[in-house]
Amino acid sequence: MGRAVGIDLGTTNSVVSVLEGGEPVVIANAEGSRTTPSVVAFAKNGEVLVGQSAKNQAVTNVDRTIRSVKRHIGTDWSVAIDDKNYTSQEISARTLMKLKRDAEAYLGEDVTDAVITVPAYFEDSQRQATKEAGQIAGLNVLRIVNEPTAAALAYGLEKGEQEQTILVFDLGGGTFDVSLLEIGDGVVEVRATSGDNELGGDDWDQRIVDWLVEKFQSSNGIDLTKDKMALQRLREAAEKAKIELSSSQSANINLPYITVDADKNPLFLDETLSRAEFQRITQDLLARTKTPFNQVVKDAGVSVSEIDHVVLVGGSTRMPAVTELVKELTGGREPNKGVNPDEVVAVGAALQAGVLRGEVKDVLLLDVTPLSLGIETKGGVMTKLIERNTTIPTKRSETFTTAEDNQPSVQIQVFQGEREIATANKLLGSFELGGIAPAPRGVPQIEVTFDIDANGIVHVTAKDKGTGKENTITIQDGSGLSQDEIDRMIKDAEAHADEDKKRREEQEVRNNAESLVYQTRKFVEENSEKVSEDLKAKVEEAAKGVEEALKGEDLEAIKAAVEKLNTESQEMGKAIYEADAAAGATQADAGAEGAADDNVVDAEVVEDDAADNGEDKK
């Protein structure tokens, strides 16, 4: 059996770690660095370059160099190189293959298994695609683990057995996550998680690029975004300036021969960016981290004062403005400085690989699903089977029925989100369960089961209990959630809570009214000979009144019509009861000749008959 490693597959950089003698070790790559740029390039001679070598030649090979592919994982994105289309999984696999090779060179043996980390807010298709990238790279992916959870695992195990509440603030190159966890006695339990899949260090870099482009255009009248090589040089300069501003008050950006003017004279770019100006042009990006932070604290049901430790993860957390914001949000608590933000996630992944391979004992990792999952039921209602922040793996079942008589099939539509109305949430996928035996509505029993595995991947099964037929879907259709959609779901759920509640109540009134009409008519049909024509006419008139009210939007009119039908139904029930009682008394007189013993028996029979008709004799 080969070795197992932990891999942090990052947007900007990736890291691989392994357990040596039970202790995690970060493996340096062939170039001697402990982090490997997540950059892949296709040289014109056919060679595929990965890591620093790919990054070094990016300026002269712009169209054939791919970076930050993690932002496209799980989508239909692809890039054409030499008439061949490469998916995000294939590009990511190239980075994983280099990490695998470098680990094998260090260990002197094969690496076969890996735990790969993903942002906590990655949805199903992104997790599936990450797993596929690992498989393409020749790795058996033991587990997909959330990055903040892996970081907490690495941090928490060093702190001994004492119970503690840890906040992980993870701002990487392309994604942002914040998680609140409880750690103690070998158990790492995620209480809540939130994030933004479209916020990371790349966005800070882009703001510097935009600033430089604007400065150059105002000075020279030339738009550098039209020049691919110039733009690549700007990106690299922006990243260096951002890093420099973490330790200096200003950064000089000097790019000679950036382009030429109309007369072919070379032009230079020379600007100085102060830390204050950098923070000004990126303040809205920083502000976007506040909402997920507040959401996590709210969902976990803890106060900021109860947080024991704050762990910063991701190279972008080195920016002073980020550190200061985290300190402000946590009531002045200093973030932990003893953790390497670039390496801690890979270390946690290696520990989890050790747990799964039995090399690390007495450690239990309990992660959560970030958004609620459910199906659409009658009236467009979102019926949640699994609530957000539920510990995974988990499995939940609920039994539903048909809405129409002799309904041959049901359409199962799977949604993810927090709104009460299904269509306001994200449709993940749908499938049909057919072959339902003909039966009145309400009779078939359809059991719907949601199963989320330890990788956070969703499987949904629908089974007809009567026939045993079932159908299953694994949500992997690439219908990913953008962060805008996730933010909208959370905000809409709060802003429209009253509206959603009202719509749900209205639908329940309508559903109950329809059901009452159906059940009443069925009852009349079954007891037709016991009810007078006059009473049957009154009941039918009341039933039609409900149907007429249901055509409109007046909820009070529906309730009034239902009340009238209930009154007439009670009169009908009373008449049926009296008819049954009279029939029983006649039978008793004819067969018992007044014997007291027989009268007791007959009374019991009458009570049974009454009970069968839904009435209590007592």
UniProtKB/Swiss-Prot annotation:
It holds the Pfam family HSP70. CDD domains: ASKHA_NBD_HSP70_DnaK-like. Induction: By stress conditions e.g. heat shock. GO terms for molecular function: ATP binding; ATP-dependent protein folding chaperone; unfolded protein binding. It comes from the Bacteria. Coiled coil: none annotated. The modification Phosphothreonine is found at residue 175. InterPro entries: ATPase_NBD, Chaperone_DnaK, Heat_shock_70_CS, HSP70_C_sf, HSP70_peptide-bd_sf, Hsp_70_fam. Keywords: ATP-binding, Chaperone, Nucleotide-binding, Phosphoprotein, Stress response. Belongs to the heat shock protein 70 family. Acts as a chaperone. This is Chaperone protein DnaK.
